[in-house]
């Protein structure tokens, strides 16, 4: 049995390069995926965060589908299925929440690069 001698050694760099190319291509969809995330923060230190269940009920009543709501330090992070849901939620949340809350698109690229 001669598995390494079944092909010429000059093919080895091409096989390794091909393997790296396949790995890179398979990872591209996960790297290019855009998260649809809204972040709610308080603008004044010490102010309480809104209740996540209340926000879920209000957004659901408006027909906005939520994937998840999670606390993250001094913020609530809300994940949505698509960008339209995220934009609609931002409009509803800005009307719903009183002054003192910051509702913004959350950039997860910074968090992913640190992980």
Swiss-Prot record:
Q: Name one GO cellular component term.
A: plasma membrane
**Which segments sit on the Cytoplasmic face?**
1-10
Membrane-topology descriptor: Single-pass membrane protein
Q: Which GO terms describe its molecular function?
A: protein kinase binding
Q: List the disulfide bonds.
A: none
Q: Where are the transmembrane segments?
A: 11-31
Q: Does the keyword Membrane feature in the UniProt annotation?
A: yes
Periplasmic membrane side: 32-115
Q: Does the keyword Membrane apply?
A: yes
Gene3D superfamilies per record: 3.30.70.260
- Primary location group: membrane
Q: Which UniProt keywords apply?
A: Cell inner membrane, Cell membrane, Membrane, Transmembrane, Transmembrane helix
Q: Cellular location of this protein? A: Cell inner membrane
One Pfam family named in its UniProt record: SecD-TM1
> The organism sits in which domain of life?
Bacteria
**What's the stated role of this polypeptide?**
Modulates the activity of the EnvZ/OmpR two-component regulatory system, probably by directly modulating EnvZ enzymatic activity and increasing stability of phosphorylated OmpR.
Q: How does it assemble?
A: Interacts with EnvZ.
Task: Spell out the family assignment given in the record's similarity comment.
Answer: Belongs to the MzrA family.
Q: Which HAMAP family match?
A: Modulator_MzrA
What this protein is called in its record is: Modulator protein MzrA
């Amino acid at each position: 049995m001669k598995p390494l001698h079944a092909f010429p050694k000059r093919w080895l760099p091409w096989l390794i390069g091909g393997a790296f190319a396949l790995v890179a291509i398979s990872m591209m969809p996960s790297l290019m995926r855009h998260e649809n995330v809204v972040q709610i923060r308080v603008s004044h230190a010490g102010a309480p965060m809104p209740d996540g269940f209340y926000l879920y009920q209000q957004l659901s009543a408006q027909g906005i589908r939520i994937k998840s709501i999670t606390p993250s330090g001094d913020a609530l992070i809300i994940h949505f299925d698509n960008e339209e849901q995220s934009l609609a939620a931002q409009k509803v949340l800005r009307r719903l929440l009183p002054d003192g809350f910051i509702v913004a698109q959350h950039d997860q690229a910074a968090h992913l690069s640190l992980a």
